[in-house]
Amino acid sequence: MSEWPTSIQITEVGPRDGLQNQSKPISTEAKISLINALSKTGLTCIETSAFVHPTWVPQLSDADEVFAGINRNSNVLYTALVPNERGWNRALAAGADEIAVLSAASETFCQRNTNTSIDGAIERIRPIVEHAVTCEVGVRGYISCVIACPYEGDTNLQTVRYITQQMLDMGITDI
């Protein structure tokens, strides 16, 4: 039996993933307050927001303001989801400590979520990862639908392996 790790890192994604689909607007001040409170809990990584187009995800249209307004704790990494190069530039300007990029192991989900194919999503994140590596900014890779897709059902494990390998080859070590 292999040895268990001595520590793990939990990334709190509530300020981004938990708030992005809320039907009622959440004020920038409330988001900042939530992140500041989470920063005092002992968490070491908080996904603060996403630098996405406001038409697609209106709840996160204030990502720049949220990053500017939080009280940074030196023991916490404040990360952001970036779906494209424009998002990367905004995250870098806002001072995100790390970024997250994404793909999905389902063509249908990928089309509906990122408006491109699996291969298109991989090619879209490649230059972002290159920029991040050059700037020494950590990158986490997300793969949605690794078990099942709400549109296609069970996921093909070979697709998950393919995306994982592509991400590893780019230099992403946290998937």
Where are each of the predicted segments found?
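Conserved N-terminal beta1-alpha1 strand-loop-helix module at the mouth
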Residues: 4-51, 59-63, 69-75
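Short, well-ordered coil/turn segments that N-cap beta-strands
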Residues: 5-8, 42-44, 72-78, 96-97, ...
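Active-site mouth loops of central-metabolism enzymes
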Residues: 11-32, 76-85, 112-117, 145-158
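Non-cysteine beta-strand/loop elements that form the S-adenosyl-L-methionine
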Residues: 11-13, 97-106, 140-144
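Conserved, mostly hydrophobic/aromatic
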Residues: 18, 38, 91, 99, ...
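Glycine-rich, proline-tolerant flexible connector loops at the mouths of alpha/beta enzymes
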Residues: 44-69, 102-117, 147-152
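Alpha-helix-loop-beta-strand connector modules within alpha/beta enzyme cores
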Residues: 56-80, 119-144, 162-166
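Catalytic cores of alpha/beta
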Residues: 85-95
